[in-house]
Amino acid sequence: MARSTGKDAQALFHSLRSAYAATPTTLKIIDLYVGFAVFTALIQVVYMAIVGSFPFNSFLSGVLSCVGTAVLAVCLRIQVNKDNKEFKDLPPERAFADFVLCNLVLHLVIMNFLG
Amino acid sequence: MAKLLLYLTLATSLIPLFSVAFSPENPTDRRVLVLVDDFAIKSSHSLYFGSLTSRGFQLEFKLADDPNIGLQRYGQYLYDALVLFCPSVERFGGSIDVASIVDFVDSGHDLIVAADSNASDLIREVATECGVDFDEDPAAMVIDHINYAVSNFDGDHTLIASDDFIKADAPVLFQGIGHSLNPANSLVLKVLSASSSAYSANPKSKLSNPPSLTGSAISLVSVVQARNNARILITGSLSMFSNRFFRSGVQKAGSSIKHEKSGNEQFLTEISKWVFHERGHLKAVNVRHHKVGESDEPAIYRINDDLEYSVEIYEWSGTSWEPYVSDDVQVQFYMMSPYVLKTLSTDQKGHYSAEFKVPDVYGVFQFKVEYQRLGYTSLSLSKQIPVRPYRHNEYERFLPAAYPYYGSAFSMMAGFFIFTIVHLYSK
């Protein structure tokens, strides 16, 4: 049984990789951006676990900037993806403009909360 | 006319000089009232009184039941110190009684009380008010069959040669009643105690039950320094001050050393110097505090300030103020309990200073110096100073602990900028 689950996992992983290779470059760039944001958030959480949460507002501000960035990037990816039937009629420029505006508001709030 | 004017100015300018007695600038007593049972004491104790007058004291001798004596008139004290050489007085004359003597001491004046083997209840009461208790048996004297002084006419071993203290050339002769001190009393001190072979009993009658006062619990000479720095000397032997004892030689029974002169004169001279504030008197002046690096005294400090506290302490040498040198004067920064306790360092010229950091607590603090040492007047200085917390713009602007968060926020902004460029201009 273990061998078959091992083989199944490997097969799954291979199919995932080949399917992912077929995605357009634009989306891959967005995925990279999201990964960078989440990675930065993880670094901050580990740092807080070591040092303690003393300037808690700064910690929240830093983590939320990463999380907010990731969330907005994911929204952009959803709206820009041509295979997504829900947003078929939305022009990608409109999606990008929303993305930029929301990021501006996010960074304004983050700078205020950073202390 | 000019001569008259000259004499007048001279006379008026000398008046303040006559009144400079027992002031804070010159703490030695000047005018001393000596109450005696009869004036024969003046001549039989002339050596002791002579030593006092030669040091500048103005002695006034009065009989203890003289109806004209009084310690104060119109609310002002006439004398700086009182000497009671009247062990058998039943009632003081004039306006003196136990309460007025206690008030006299309470106002900071000094007292010497000498009892003897026929001490009256009044003298015992005065001593009890001062904190020592004479033996209740009215006929008891201190007897010591081992440490007695060999003499020609005494056969009952009541003349004691005591050398239970340091730095005397010869033993001190004592003949009289003993007293005991309450061990809980921290103000009273035994100067000369009887040896462990002494006891207090009637020498003329047989002992029916064991004596209540024995051994070194018997104190022969005690001093009391009150909290207002008034000093009291209490002893149970008036003859200790007499010329006869001053001049006689001493030979302790059982030892072959024969001292030419007893240690009475030296001992009593030194202890009178202490009682009348010629020695062991301290004053602390010039309390200053300021921030390190500044020189004027601020009205308020902030937490975590560095400050410096300084004080000058002088000791009276009998004629002038000398710098007091010691390494155990401490200052407290006190609010309900001492937050900082620091030993002051001295420059050997009487100037003491210490530097410390204001604690991380705000409130109203006091700089307190509480200095009580054996034989010296107690110093109790206190200066109040408030301490405030940080103002809102006195905190650190950027916290080093939060640098990663600052970094991540800015890196997100940079990443967003780069990403928009890449996203827009890639195919």
Swiss-Prot record, chain A:
Instruction: Provide the transmembrane region boundaries.
Output: 32-52, 56-76, 95-115
Report how it sits in the membrane. Answer: Multi-pass membrane protein
Q: Name one GO biological process term.
A: protein N-linked glycosylation
Annotated pathway, please?
Protein modification; protein glycosylation
Mind telling me which GO cellular component terms the entry cites? oligosaccharyltransferase complex
Compartments it resides in: Endoplasmic reticulum membrane
Please state the protein's primary subcellular location.
endoplasmic reticulum
Q: Which residues point to the Lumenal side?
A: 53-55
Q: Which UniProt keywords apply?
A: Apoptosis, Endoplasmic reticulum, Membrane, Transmembrane, Transmembrane helix
Entry keyword Amino-acid biosynthesis: no
Tell me if Membrane is a UniProt keyword of this record: yes
Q: Which InterPro entries match?
A: DAD/Ost2
Query: Which regions of this chain are Cytoplasmic-facing, per the record's topological domains?
Result: 1-31, 77-94
Superkingdom, taxonomy of origin = Eukaryota
Q: What does this protein do?
A: Subunit of the oligosaccharyl transferase (OST) complex that catalyzes the initial transfer of a defined glycan (Glc(3)Man(9)GlcNAc(2) in eukaryotes) from the lipid carrier dolichol-pyrophosphate to an asparagine residue within an Asn-X-Ser/Thr consensus motif in nascent polypeptide chains, the first step in protein N-glycosylation. N-glycosylation occurs cotranslationally and the complex associates with the Sec61 complex at the channel-forming translocon complex that mediates protein translocation across the endoplasmic reticulum (ER). All subunits are required for a maximal enzyme activity.
Subunit-structure text: Component of the oligosaccharyltransferase (OST) complex.
Q: Which PANTHER family match?
A: DOLICHYL-DIPHOSPHOOLIGOSACCHARIDE--PROTEIN GLYCOSYLTRANSFERASE SUBUNIT DAD1
What family is reported? Belongs to the DAD/OST2 family.
Record-given protein name: Dolichyl-diphosphooligosaccharide--protein glycosyltransferase subunit DAD1
Record the organism: Citrus unshiu
